[in-house]
């Protein structure tokens, strides 16, 4: 019926009657989303999250709504409440949290930050490459354990792994970035990017990341990412003919 005026009237009465029910704030946030007010929807989801700080699902949805409202930094801080390492860094990439990467990439693309949009789409691409490569570890295991049903299901899944919605979104998103880059003056973009790259590579953050990578003995591509801000990736992308 899309009678938002009546819907808000009833939901406000319900919240006034029992202001501690989380679901009421969630429903009101959804109403604002349907009405097209993402800013208010994100605020209400954050209010709902604060009523139950132990609810991981609410935390994730509140983060999603913040990203869709282009509040990426605030969303990262919210996600960090449940998804961070001992050093305080987010582990969403290590956990293959593709919805988060996809939403962040789309937000950065809307903001015109092609570097970080490309980096987040690249994270998703790496996840699927890793999933595809991991099948080789399962070949001998599946045959040795005679788990043929699971083995054949795995083979069928790997044949269509790149049809996954996140793989498709990442591919289309990368194409959108490429189209935006193709419209730029590449010489000017490279000249503008060069001092940013030099400043970042001389920063304390970058040097600390490189020192930590040298100390680690695992081969995790996400924990040992030498280019977490996507400067090298974007610089190479811009230099393509």
Regions found by a protein language model. Give the residues of each.
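Acidic, serine/threonine- and proline-enriched intrinsically disordered linkers and terminal tails
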Residues: 176-240
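Structural register within alpha-helical repeat arrays
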Residues: 28, 61-62, 104, 154, ...
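Short coil turns that delineate tetratricopeptide repeat
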Residues: 19, 53, 87, 129, ...
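Helix-start (N-cap) detector for alpha-helical repeat units in TPR-like alpha-solenoids
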Residues: 21-23, 55-57, 73, 98, ...
